[in-house]
Amino acid sequence: MLAHARRRSLWVALTILCSLIALATLAAYLWLVAGLPRLDDLHAYAGAPSSKVYDRHGELLFEMPPPYTGRHSPVPLDEMPEALRQATIATEDASFYDNPGVDSRAILRSAWLNLRSGQIVSGASTITQQLARNLLMSPEERYEQTLTRKLREAILAWRITRRYTKDEILALYLNEIYFGNLAYGVEAAAQTYFGKHVRDLDLAESAMLAGLPQSPPYHNPFENPENAKARQAVVLSLMVRQGYITADQARRAGEEKLYYAPAVFDIQAPHFVMYVRGLLERELGLERLE
């Protein structure tokens, strides 16, 4: 009789404990998701494209970046070279097309490295997590090195993956990520560094661009060409590891001499451009123009 009463008391205690854990977990989840942005239209959070002035023949005279940002010219995914897409996935998120927005193995590996060092030395952000952080989080929260921020980022990434296709996510990411030198997105980056449209990039150029987002200032090919070249080699080796290219293709791309574009904001026909800018500013207002 006494043993039966003890077993019953134990089951009651376990039931209460499990209920408390479940309630605490639910409360923690509700606290984490409080204030998270809606995902009805991710494109609404994207950066505004630059204003452009053309001559009567359709030649670009000048590009006016939005204030506090930089050059930005979104393009469809099918206008981005396959090599650039593959280089980005190999470098930033090898399991992109298979993971649910977060990579559990990368998280565990990163957690172990951070635990061993006693500080955050390794990240585990997928492409979707990076998109969530850069597009949906405030600048203050974006750079927080806290568990709360990482959990909110993971929840957003999971929700994005449930709502959008992988190609839609990849296109948004490649159109929004920062490449340095005031270039946001692959089209602006291709124009900034190589003076050409992104669709015209070859493997060597694609690998160079794909390596920039990790640390645009450090890998800036204009100011740190040796760092940029070393980063390109890392990207090419990752592409080989993922089976996107052969070792011989990587070697030839690494040996290719790259030709960079001149200054970013050169103005053709400056007097005419400034005249047009003045007319547009009076007609549309500064905020709508930029």
Model regions: which residues?
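N-terminal type II signal-anchor transmembrane helix
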Residues: 1-54, 95, 115
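Terminal hydrophobic membrane-targeting helix
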Residues: 32-83, 87
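Residues immediately flanking
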Residues: 56, 64, 91-94, 176, ...
